[in-house]
Amino acid sequence: MKWQKKGLLTTMLVGIALMGVACGNKSNSSSNNSNKTSEYDYVYATDPDNFDYTVTSRATNSTHLVNFVNGLLENDKYGRLVGAMAKSWDVSKDGKTYTYHLRNNINWVDSEGNPYAKVTAQDFVTGLKHAVDAKSETLYVVQNSIVGLSDYASGKTKDFSKVGVKALNSKTVQYTLLKPESYWNSKMTYGVMYPVNAKFLKSQGKNFGNATTNGILYNGPFILSNFTSKSVIEYKKNENYWDKKHVYLNDVKLTYNDGSNPDGLYKSFIKGDYTQARVYPTSADYKNVVKQSKNNITWSDQDSSNYGFVFNLNRQSYTATSKKTTKAKEDTKKAILNRDFRLAIRFGFNKSAYNAQSTGDAGAARSLRNELTPPSFVQVDGKDYGDAVAQDLAQSDPAAFSGVNLADAQDGTFDAAKAKQYMAKAKKALQAQGVSFPIHLDLPADQKAALTLNKAKSFKSTVEKNLGKDNVIIDIQLLSEDKYLAATYQATTAAASDYDLSNASGWSPDFDDPSSYLEIYNPNSGSNLMNLGLDVGTSKTAGDAAAKKSINMSEYGELLAKADAITNDNNARYAAYAKAEAWLLNSGIQITVNSLGGTPSVSRVVPYSGPYAQSGLFTSGDSRQGSTSFKGVKIQAKPVTIAQQNKARKAWLAKRAEIAKQEESSNN
């Protein structure tokens, strides 16, 4: 999607409610649930803090907002883009003009469910203008797509009428693009393109988008009925929703969970309090889970997200650190700017052992990922995109990457011998610069989140073992949840990113193109540059300029620009992006570890009943299928069985394959 900032999702969301798993428990083990087929109950891990859906990029907000507000299009259960507010649309022959025709009688309602106004074409114009005026964190999704939008956003023009979005009448909205984008419609599921009612916006002023029940209007399947910080979030069905016949839940209740008692999820499921529950093979109580539910524990599929580690290339904040001297800080910074040092960390990191902390050995490899963009996200001349990346990566540095396997569900980069080799090279070069060893790397961790803390400890263990404590020491910084988030996931500037390396954040694509992954590190506009400790565009500090020069970020920017310029040949476009991705992997500035999914759960959610998406606001690590939306989701009286899950998955995959074949035929 999105940042997860959403498109970012944090690895803290261990038990997030919106990961509705298509799996279950023994049919006789949670009889208290039998009457709760119209209510979904589970947990959430982090409070939402912004309901301005045109602005926020954080998954902790968008996972809720996708249930409250609809845009022009949405994803159905098979991943197809279908009409939401729009009933139909037209595309010009040159691929630059998209015209959407709205449904009749679609309503905005207030937090009590009372009709407020009709949704009109002008609301989409208002929404985009507000996104710019409110300095949207997600404007990058469309800023360089729509005619005149970049000029308006930069202040070159103050006349919004010159921007390529027009309400042709109350039911017709039209967008004019700078160049053709085959993936344009997939951007319609993103919040920056959602409508805003001008009257309500004006009445709310600065309070618009507050994380309260009355901070926004609703035109989606649910209405927020209650939000009490670090306590509970509750939705109720929107009875004025245009497609309410496909909303099968009357209520959604999410209870705050700080992650300190993972075993409690299953126990609450058994008691009938929760609709589903993650289960943890590494837990001492897991044997009881298996005893009670062995025929119902199923594993979710990988989604399109990725999580991993990023190096802070220009650290400026040192609130959470074990370093005592200025020299220690400078030595670490020099080490991080050394490519061989970064590659040594990557090769010395056992991702399977890390992942096993939450899934056990049986699930250790299930969600592993080795590149930023999933290997099968798009096709290049009939082959997976990942194949092209692997070929380009091997050619860029045969000694380091020849034979490296980038496929999902296996650790393609762990190589202890190679790690020692690259550490020796790095140490020789760094000692010549006066750097003292061992290098200390600060890694923040939430002190109460037991599972993610165990992952941090695993990272420390394997890296120090394979590289030697005389070379590298990982200093885990135990922080409160609020301080942890402030230093990592919620840091909005490079200067606020307080770590040497971090595993706090992840990413899901905003739209169906590799650029949605790779542009996050664009040196001129990248929305994730702050995670690397870097400024967007012109450097604000000498350290920033030196860091960008050290890793040759300008070359990466040039590769992205070359790929983006190709608009009439998707094979050539994707091949060009594969070269950019190979550059990113070669640089070692980030380490992709895993996606969401690949986890065991028990559940009463009917398998594959909800929407599926690989990009946009509808994505998350949802093992129902990859959606945060509860539209279409069904709950059954008895827990889902393994046999039911497998049968549903087989049918769902077959239908997806049939649809893909039909789409390929129509495109030809």
What are these regions (language model features)?
Residues 122-124, 174, 250-251, 305-387, ...:
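Alpha-helical secondary-structure segments
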Residues 160, 171, 177-255, 264, ...:
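Gly/Pro-rich hinge or "lid" segments in bacterial periplasmic/extracellular proteins
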Residues 87-141, 331-337, 342:
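Aromatic- and charge-enriched surface segment that lines or borders ligand/interaction sites
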Residues 123, 133-200:
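Surface-exposed binding/hinge segments that line
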Residues 363, 399-509, 595, 656-657, ...:
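Ligand/substrate-recognition segments at binding pockets and active sites
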Residues 225-240, 255-324, 352, 356-361:
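Extracellular/periplasmic solute-recognition and catalytic clefts
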Residues 346-393, 451-461, 492-668:
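Detector for C-terminal structural segments
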